[in-house]
Amino acid sequence: MKIQKILYRAFVFTNLVLAISFMLYTLNLTRGNDLFDFQVFYGAARNVLAGSSIYTNYGAANLPFWYFPWVSWIFLPLTFFPFEIASLIFLTTGLVIVAVVIHFLTKHYQGFDIFDRTYMFSMVIWISWLGYRVGQMSYFVLGGAVLVVFVLAREQKYLAGLCLPLLLLKPHLFLIFIPLVLWMGGWKTVLTGALTTLSLFGIEFLVTPDWVRQMLGLLTHGVGCLDTNPGWKFTTLSSLIGLGQNYVGTAALLLTIILVAVAAFVVVRFHFLPKIPLLSLAMTASLFCAPRANAYDLILLVPALIWLSEKWSIKTALIWVAATLILFLSHFSAGSYLVTVMVLALCIYKANSIEKRKRVPVFLPKN
């Protein structure tokens, strides 16, 4: 075995141990007190069982439940456990989802071995530091999005529609991705997606007839709440350049519209890409123009990062390092938006290179 392989494998193992150790250290340091978002999900699920309204504030940070009803239903099984155990099950399940996502994406592109996959897994743990610290459902959102990607890639258009509510866990993160999914899936995806979503809405109407009013009440309150958190600001362009943003994402509406137009142009420009890379690009473009996003949402860049790593080398491995360093140097705050910009720029470069290789040169006959 070459010395390079031995060193690489030793590095991968060390990196994995360090990533897991740092995760456990973080969780032990905070003692679960910083699981502000998980307190919201867990509390909403408990309210479902109690027959109370889910649209209220929860936890030590008094955060609101700004999601569609079925988000609380997903967490119902966890309510049968104490909070501490439930949060551990939640985190473990999320990490399993990440491992499955990496396995299937790397299997699709091929050329990766178990050490490459392990390296990616450990880097995702680093990247998702804020996610597991506050107890966000980022791993589940990633899993739902990648599930839709593979379902569409296999032309299972009806099933793609059935999975649409998974994208609505955080619809503001999929402004480009969802329209592309509906366009690629055609009327079959649109029909089943609409029926599935309306059915879920109908169930909530039966349980809580005025849930829309309750939800809009919380959203209206969020319009006046600006992102003034000195620690973890939104990872959006508006926050990066100091324009500020509210908790609904409407404070910089004109800028958002411009970014959506740019992101849509990029995806349309490279529509010739195979389905999985194209959808990965659309996921990245969606984060680029998201009106509201946090550093824990950047885990949605993983499909694009794996595509960029298709021909595995030290250079592609360093992309993951660069993304992680930017996140930690920016303290998972507004500067983290640069990770999205970097990944999108690299995706555009790769897509452009693919297009150039596909061009067939025209040779004129000699006179």
Protein language model regions, located:
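Primarily membrane-embedded glycan-assembly and transfer machineries that use lipid-linked glycans
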Residues: 1-159, 181-302, 306-310, 357-362
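A short, terminal or domain-edge coil/loop segment
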Residues: 172, 218-221, 344
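Contiguous hydrophobic segments
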Residues: 136-145, 163-173, 236-247, 319-337
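Membrane-interface alpha helices of multi-pass inner-membrane proteins
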Residues: 158-171, 175-182, 281-289, 322-328
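Aromatic-enriched
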Residues: 310-367
